[in-house]
Amino acid sequence: MIKRYEACFLFKSEEIEYKGSLEEVKKSLEFFGATDVVSNFIGERALEYPIKKQARGRYEIIEFSMEGNNLKEFESRLKLIKNLLRYMILVKIVRKINTKKIKRRNFREFRDNVDKDSLKGASKVETPTGPESTDIQEK
């Protein structure tokens, strides 16, 4: 069964090594029959702790669709890429959002807030104070 995956890759920070490793990953994806491949460069960042004696790394997120049984073979191929420091592959779950329920919930919250505000306003009865108020009450 074809599933949608999202993978985060951490490469060495050197430009030439990064580009070469990224091309290897994309060729591996193509070899294992991945479709709808979308790649996003996140950036180069300092690592919290050294990974394989590297203090900085480049992050890349790649989304793709692939057969589930090809994934293990793809992961074994990733372990052979020299300049790839870390990777993480997740199944991307696509959920449809029911907008009617959201609209109802928002309306209920709005209605409840209006009711609370109107009750607060009704409990505040202004009582006249001062010399003008006694004149009004006497007439």
Curated annotation (Swiss-Prot):
Chain intervals with Polar residues compositional bias: 130-139
CDD domains hit by this protein: bS6 (cd00473)
Pfam families: Ribosomal_S6
Keyword Ribonucleoprotein: yes
Keyword entries, A-Z: Ribonucleoprotein, Ribosomal protein, RNA-binding, rRNA-binding
InterPro entries named in the record: Ribosomal_bS6, Ribosomal_bS6_sf, Ribosomal_S6_plastid/chlpt, Transl_elong_EF1B/ribsomal_bS6
Gene Ontology biological process terms from the UniProt entry: translation
GO cellular component annotations of the record: ribonucleoprotein complex; ribosome
Gene Ontology molecular-function annotations: rRNA binding; structural constituent of ribosome
UniProt region (Disordered), positions on chain: 119-139
Family: Belongs to the bacterial ribosomal protein bS6 family.
Known role: Binds together with bS18 to 16S ribosomal RNA.
Protein name: Small ribosomal subunit protein bS6
Lineage, broadest ranks: Bacteria, Pseudomonadati, Spirochaetota, Spirochaetia, Spirochaetales
